[in-house]
Swiss-Prot record:
It comes from Bos taurus (Bovine). The gene is MYADML2. This is Myeloid-associated differentiation marker-like protein 2. It is a multi-pass membrane protein. Residues 17-154, 159-303 form the MARVEL domain. Pfam families: MARVEL.
Length: 307
């Protein structure tokens, strides 16, 4: 099942879940997450897609953090049909990315040093500044957990706690950014070549998600072939696919024969296809580098297969 029952004779409550370094980081996550969410909901305020994303990210991270701390403290994680080490490592990395994004977006769109006009006034400004500070602290709390639980070189660990496993979460997150730019009037349907790039992004994203799900559910040991070898082969193919997209997408979007080499002067901000194409191109190279790093690290990892 991928989970491990606690040995008999131990207490029902595990105090180390809140007193250990990792436990302390998780308690701080709850404190900072609840404070940030409360400040924004009470007087800070939010609006639009950006504000909704921030609140959703904080709410999601807080809810799962409560689940993790509760299961660790009561030892109920041993009853779950999943690999607990893989689950907590994957969630900590995802929460780090989400909280980092929200910690950048909220101050950028909602925080100003000058007081807004009434009825909001300086009170709303102060709440937004405080929420921005606690959002940054929340990111640091999740990043601390990732640093504390990451597998060290030569250490036998769950796959998602290795650098390769953590990179899988980052790759999927970057792919979501690419998808967001694609659907925002990127005009990817004009050429078969750019449609091929979309297929590459989708295929690699789905394969990465499958690897993460298999690890979290604890089914990496019954695939008929070694899981680490399968991951290396997939990562190598992903590097080749992303390499093709890294060449094709800029050519068909920014070459004068097919697209615009520079941003059109009459292109409106916030709804300019060229901007979306630039975002896709930039994060294509980011993900290519992530897959190359993943391939390099996956050559030397050792992790515990789960059944």
């Amino acid at each position: 099942m991928g989970s491990t029952m606690e040995p008999p004779g131990g207490g029902y409550l595990h105090l180390g879940a809140v007193t250990s370094p990792v436990g302390t980081a998780r308690v701080l996550q709850l404190v900072f997450g609840c404070t940030t969410f409360s400040l924004v909901a009470h007087r800070g305020g939010f609006s639009g897609v950006q504000g909704t994303f921030c609140v959703a990210a904080w709410g999601f991270c807080f809810a799962l953090s409560v689940l993790v701390v509760a299961c660790e403290f009561t030892r109920l994680h041993g009853c779950l049909r999943l690999s607990w080490g893989n689950f907590t490592a994957a969630f900590a990395m995802l929460a780090t990315l989400l909280s980092a994004t929200a910690a950048v977006i909220y101050p950028l769109y909602f925080t100003r040093l000058e007081c807004p006009p009434e009825p909001e006034g300086c009170t709303a400004r102060n709440f937004r500044l405080a929420a921005s500070v606690f959002a940054g602290l929340l990111f640091l709390a999740y990043a601390t957990e990732v640093a504390l639980t990451r597998a060290r070189p030569g250490q036998v660990a769950s796959y998602m706690a290795t650098v390769s496993g953590l990179l899988k979460i980052v790759q999927a997150f970057v792919a979501c950014i690419i998808f967001g730019a694609l659907v925002h009037d990127s005009r990817y349907g004009r050429y078969v070549a750019t449609q091929w790039c979309v297929a590459v992004y989708s295929l690699c994203f789905l394969a990465t998600v499958v690897v993460v799900i298999l690890s979290v559910l604890g089914h990496t040991g019954g695939l008929g072939c070694p899981f680490d070898r399968m991951v290396v082969v997939y990562t190598f193919l992903a590097v080749l696919l992303y390499l093709s997209a890294a060449v094709i997408w800029p050519v068909f979007c920014f070459d004068p024969k097919y697209g615009e080499p520079g941003r059109p002067p009459d292109c409106p901000r916030g709804s300019c296809p060229w901007d979306s194409q630039l975002v896709v191109a930039t994060f294509t190279y980011v993900n290519l580098l992530l897959y190359v790093a993943d391939l390099a690290y996956s050559q030397r990892i050792r992790f515990v297969p789960t059944f």
